[in-house]
Regions:
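N-terminal glycine-rich FAD/FM-binding segment characteristic of electron-transfer flavoproteins
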Residues: 1-139
Length: 139
């Protein structure tokens, strides 16, 4: 399963959750790449290259983290790279962008994942529901 990890950063360094997102991606896929979005990304792409091959969308128009703009870029990258799974941190920033990306791709987004299994090539995610009163398995 070809996987793309969206690396979150603050403009100077990657956020710590990005490493956890890469760790999850490695557990479910052998074919991963990371995507860094923004402007003046040299420091972030160098740091990201320690995790996996890096794809960078570096442009002044991407300096502000506007979800609509970034989601369209992620969609173009996902289509060009034949990505099957997009992974990101569990932050408000990532949920906004990945939710829009999923909509543009005609897919779905699973958030706040608390567990996963890979059974016969099928990824199953455990997510809380009803304010944590129950858990659901999403296929």
């Amino acid at each position: 399963m070809k996987t793309l990890v969206i690396m979150e950063h603050d403009g100077a360094a990657l956020r710590s959750g990005s490493g956890a997102a890469v760790g999850f991606a490695r557990e479910v896929s052998e074919d991963i790449a990371v995507l860094v979005l923004g402007d003046n990304l040299n420091a972030m792409t160098t740091e990201a290259s320690k995790f996996a091959p890096v794809l960078a969308a570096d442009h002044p128009a991407l300096a502000a983290p506007v979800a609509d703009r970034l989601a369209h870029v992620i969609v173009e990258v996902a289509r060009a790279q034949n990505i099957e799974l997009i992974v990101a941190t569990a932050t408000t920033w990532a949920k906004d962008i990945v939710g829009r990306t999923a909509g543009l791709l005609g897919g779905a987004m699973a958030s706040d994942v608390i567990g996963h299994e890979l059974i016969d090539g099928e990824l199953r995610l455990r997510c809380p529901m009803f304010a944590g009163a129950a858990n659901a398995t999403v296929v």
